[in-house]
Amino acid sequence: MKSKIVLVLLSLMSAGVQAGVIKGKIKDAQTGEEIIGASVIVKEDPGKGTVTGLDGSFNLSVNRDKYTLVCSYVGYKKYEVSVAADKKEIVIPLKSDDVALDEVVVVASNPGRTEAGARGIERQAMNVVNVMSAKAIELSPDITVANVIQRMSGVTIERNSSGEGQYAILRGMDKRYNYTLVNGVKIPSPDNKNRFVPLDIFPSEMLDRLEVTKSLTANMEGDGIGGAVNLIMKDAPSERQFTVNLSTGYNAMYFDRDFQSFNHGAIVKKSPYEQMGMPEDSRVTMDNFTTDNLRMKWNKPLPDLTAGLSYGDRFFNNKLGVMLAGSYLNTYRGKESQLYYQPGTTHNGIEYRNYSSQQTRIGAHAKLDYHINANHKLTWYNGYMDMREAEVRDGHDDKEGAVRMKWNHQYIINSTLKGEHAFLEGGALRLNWSAVLSKAYSETPDNAEIFLLGNHVQTSGAAIRRWEHNSDKDKAGYLDLMYKLKLDGGSVFDFSVGGMYRDKKRDSFFNEYTFNSATGVKDPQYQGEDWNNYDEILFTPLKYGNISDPLNYDATEKIGAGYGMVKYTYQKWEFIAGVRVEHTNQGYTLKFPTENTDPEGYQKYTDVLPSFHVKYGVHKNANLRFSYARSINRPSFFEIVPYSIINEDYKEKGNPD
């Protein structure tokens, strides 16, 4: 009995001695660069193997005294090495396969699509970056980028009136202190006053990954005090891929209440002024307006609908990659809120507001990449993001009330042509360039608000109807030149210089009309209760309406920038220093200037923006970082225009001189 126990213990000890973990790295024998995605297989046990990570490393469990590793990667010669069990870490060099073949382009998969790849991008990044992979986005229930981004570290979102996430707040700083990129290129905003981009216009399913940068380097645009949000759109896969998704749901809020809607299809897109100009007597009548869009309905909404379609493939011996994707989202949202007014203001007490909102989003993008050869690549991206929202806001307090019927349409178009070129041995010299055309547009035609006193429409100032639209057009070019210098001892210098130029043009239009009610009492012929059928109210417009508003302007902005940056890498240390210079030329022209305001204005300024970053690799999965960067916050176009807003919930005035 004792001999059996001893035999079992000896067997367990023997197994424990034989089992172990071998760690290693696979590098290019000529350049010393780590090879990502190389295959490592145990020759004696072909079923046991792994692939190298983003830093070229691998871990492999073995249970032999001696074994042979077979290492291979496309474009390199297969390499076999015998390893003893007591050797815990090795470095394996792969030599380039110089056999002459017909030209073949090898396309690797995007590592950022997986969680492991996203974490690798974060570790290898020069600055502080958080990445959400396509896999994580697919698993989340969020249908817009605005809701996806709130799941990232150090990021919160600002919601709109219907409760939907809309703008990103980075590091606790207001939305104006960050900017938005698509595939590394800044895009314009459809907002009529500000620069920030609403992230709810982007369907999340069109993303390859989402990056949030919290510290700027010199090769990034300098107006991001809070950071930058970069949307990397789906790229062509390595093999044919076709996906379809369809989902539905229902907003539980409408189990207990009806959805308020209005006939937004009857809205006339152009105001009377846009249709016929200024009349001779400076007056308009109700014949110049339609009231069909003021008819409201109360019913149960249809279920939400989400649909998506994408197709990707590679052609011409993998030289040409194509990714086509489309998305459709139709959702019904609602919210109940309270607005508190300070004593002594226009309103007193609390205003209770109920929101009903139908949001329709359409997204389409096409991304093509062409590999001329192993050293030269062209990419052409075209994207169209569209959002339409029909919203009813029903507000009231103890005495007064107001109902607003608003339809808003926004879209962003972006077309970017990029080139990536490598020169010299091992691609030591690299040149990247981009040519960009973008447009953002927003329109809110016939935004109607009707004011009530109890069950009656106010006689004076019974309603306001306004037309607004604006567009933002960008033409931009980017150029980056990078050179890698490897020294004896393993240290590496990376030198970068580059610049960008952007020409932005913005136009904004605003036209508002005030109406009185022809009668202040409820007429029995009007249907419904509490003046719900607003299209039957007898309104009378006051004179012509207001077009002398600061929101009627044309503006231009020209930005030129250049930078220089150097990165030094030695063992676990990485130092990055750079400086960026940006010159800004802004100007505006008021279309209908009022008295005591400047009809034109211009300003020019230059900013010098240094940055310095240090990274120390404590562990393969952990880094210590220090970052310093100087950045700016440019005023929006509306902020340099002398303006005064008196028809919102509060009064606002700016730049009187």
Where are these regions (language model features)?
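Transmembrane beta-barrel wall of Gram-negative outer-membrane proteins
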Residues: T291-R393, I413-S415, F612
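Surface-exposed extracellular loop regions of Gram-negative outer-membrane beta-barrel proteins
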Residues: K186, R388, Y441-N447, K505-D507, ...
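Short, acidic Ser/Thr/Gly-rich low-complexity loop/linker segments typical of extracellular
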Residues: P46-S57, V83
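Extracytoplasmic beta-strand/coil segments of soluble accessory domains associated
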Residues: N59, A146-K186, G227-A228
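Outer-membrane beta-barrel signature, preferentially recognizing the C-terminal barrel domain
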Residues: E400-H421, I547-G560, Q603, I632-D657
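A beta-strand signature from Gram-negative outer-membrane beta-barrel systems
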Residues: I92, I201-N245
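Short, acidic, small-residue-rich periplasmic hinge/interaction motif at the N-terminus
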Residues: K27-T31, A38-K43, S72-Y76, E89-E138, ...
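Short acidic/polar hinge/loop motifs at secondary-structure boundaries
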Residues: N59-S61, I157, V185-K214, F259-S261
